[in-house]
Amino acid sequence: LKLLFVADIFAQPGRRVAAALIPEVVREREIDFVIVNGENAAGGFGLTDNIARKLHSYGADIITSGNHIWDCKEFMPYLAQSDRVLRPFNYPTAAPGIGSVVATARNGVSVAVLNLQGRTGMPTTDCPFLAGRAEAERLREQTPLVFVDFHAEATAEKMAMGFHLDGLVTAVVGTHTHVQTADERILPGGTAYLTDAGMTGVRESVIGVRPEMALQRFLTQVPTRFKPAEGKATLCGALVEVDASNGRATRIERLQLEEA
């Protein structure tokens, strides 16, 4: 099985390059299942009903997220009833939405997706290590293919999660920083790992934001509402190849694809 993960889609430029390249990658690389992180898809902050539907139309089977999933309050009713859009699993159970799901790939294989959020430098949540392992074990009872999007700030926390779940899940791929790391590998237990998949948006930016606005914030320390950068966009992410019989990853490849 071939699984495509698309890193944090940032605002309209990210949606534009996702619309153009996801179908192309699915076709050319014979992808069976697509996961995208959509928490920044609405202007950089959150998600809307309409944008979620668009991401699905581009080919996304499941949409994962992180702390920005709560930014658009009007999206909460959609999130509460959707089984294709995830919020981090380790939020309290009373929070709208679900944090894991088992879906069917194009080749008929069942794939579980688990969304977790870190705690270092992030909003307070339940422990992702305890909650994540327990849920991964539950999901493994339904399918050996379990993909984890770990939305976290700290590199060390992400690396620790990779080893914590090694051999139990198919892949642990980090999101949130919008800067792709170059440490993709298969861990000793057969789990594919990448500290951060990066960002799908404008490369010539400060993690998706117009550079002059980010600089103004750093120079003055005055809070300001950021605006998304404009220009040529890049799709970042990862392609994971899996032995569907046991859920172990056989290969992971980083992706950086520029729009035409």
Give short role names for the model-derived ranges.
Residues 1-260:
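Acidic, metal/ion-coordinating pockets
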